[in-house]
Curated annotation (Swiss-Prot):
Transmembrane segments: none annotated. Part of the 30S ribosomal subunit. It comes from Salinispora tropica (strain ATCC BAA-916 / DSM 44818 / JCM 13857 / NBRC 105044 / CNB-440). Keywords: Ribonucleoprotein, Ribosomal protein, RNA-binding, rRNA-binding. Gene3D superfamilies: Nucleic acid-binding proteins. One of the primary rRNA binding proteins, it binds specifically to the 5'-end of 16S ribosomal RNA. GO terms for cellular component: cytosolic small ribosomal subunit. This is Small ribosomal subunit protein uS17.
Amino acid sequence: MSENTTATTRARRKVREGLVVSDKMDKTVVVEVEDRVKHGLYGKIMRRTSKLKVHDEQNSAGIGDRVLIMETRPLSATKRWRLVEILEKAK
């Protein structure tokens, strides 16, 4: 009788790059992420943006910063992303 062992592997987490548009909340920033989508019928490439609430533990990001974010477990009713690093500070 062989014991069936399965190694549980964690799924790859989504990583996005975006621009901070609000830092008024404590330990939270709002990041606007751009996605380019091709129209199904006409083929035109369109820009779609979505605003995501991101957990910023040290309150280090400010408005205008370009940041790298990663998907995580739900931290609140609307927060499912966390700040990985600040790629470029605002001028």
